[in-house]
């Protein structure tokens, strides 16, 4: 990880400026999105605008700067209700909430950008990969952070070794 860039994907000028200032960027890891299912049901426009429009802005800037690789943080919410278990990549995608639909829409957009511009994508469809509680007793704000993926990203940004502060708790395998 060469650079962690904080910004707002809803501002295309910020993306353009960032890519202009960093011409050696050859790939993007895209984790920026709203991700609360319950909130997405109450305020779907917020999720569609942020998750879809923000990604379109990013893809357009990537196209303009010749960046043709992206890792996209999608979600298992694109699958909807399981038709079989365990769920695999070939499982039908039928989201049941705006959050899942916003992520699936972005996946379809990425298919179109691949066909039109050659932007290759890898999509990560997480299943509460770091131990989130299905009863929502564990939220997204932890002090100290207890989820694996945020700890790995923090370590990458700080260029330190990632640690697991909850060694006694099991992580869900995926």
Question: Which residue ranges define each predicted feature?
Answer:
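Short, conserved active-site loop motifs that form the nucleotide-linked donor/cofactor pocket
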Residues: 1-3, 121, 171
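Conserved Rossmann-fold cofactor-binding substructure of NAD(P)-dependent oxidoreductases
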Residues: 2-27
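Alpha-helical elements of Rossmann-like donor-binding domains used by nucleotide-donor carbohydrate transfer enzymes
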Residues: 14-17, 27, 57, 108-109, ...
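Residue-level signal for alpha-helix termini/capping positions
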Residues: 20-23, 63-64, 115, 157
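N-terminal Rossmann-like NAD(P) cofactor-binding module of classical short-chain dehydrogenase/reductase
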Residues: 26-29, 71
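Conserved NAD(P)H cofactor-binding loop of Rossmann-fold oxidoreductase domains
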Residues: 31-35, 74-75
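A conserved pocket-lining segment of Rossmann-fold NAD(P)-dependent short-chain dehydrogenase/reductase
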Residues: 40, 127-174
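Catalytic helix-loop patch of NAD(P)-dependent Rossmann-fold dehydrogenases
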Residues: 42-57, 64, 68-69, 78-147
């Amino acid at each position: 990880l060469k650079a962690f860039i904080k910004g707002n994907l809803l501002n295309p000028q910020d993306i353009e400026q960032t890519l202009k200032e960093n011409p050696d960027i050859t790939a993007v890891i895209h984790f920026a999105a709203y991700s609360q299912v319950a909130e997405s049901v109450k305020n779907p426009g917020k999720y569609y605008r942020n998750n879809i429009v923000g990604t379109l802005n990013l893809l357009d800037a990537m196209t303009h700067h010749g960046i043709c690789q992206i890792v996209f943080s999608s979600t298992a919410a694109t699958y909807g209700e399981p038709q079989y278990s365990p769920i695999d990549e070939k499982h039908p995608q039928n989201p049941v909430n705006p959050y899942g639909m916003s992520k699936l829409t972005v996946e379809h957009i990425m298919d179109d950008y691949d066909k039109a511009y050659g932007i290759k994508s890898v999509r990560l469809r997480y299943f509460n990969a770091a131990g989130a509680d299905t009863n929502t007793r564990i939220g997204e704000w932890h002090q100290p952070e207890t989820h694996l993926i945020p700890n790995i990203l923090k370590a990458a940004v700080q260029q330190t070794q990632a640690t697991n502060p909850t060694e006694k708790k099991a992580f869900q395998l995926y």
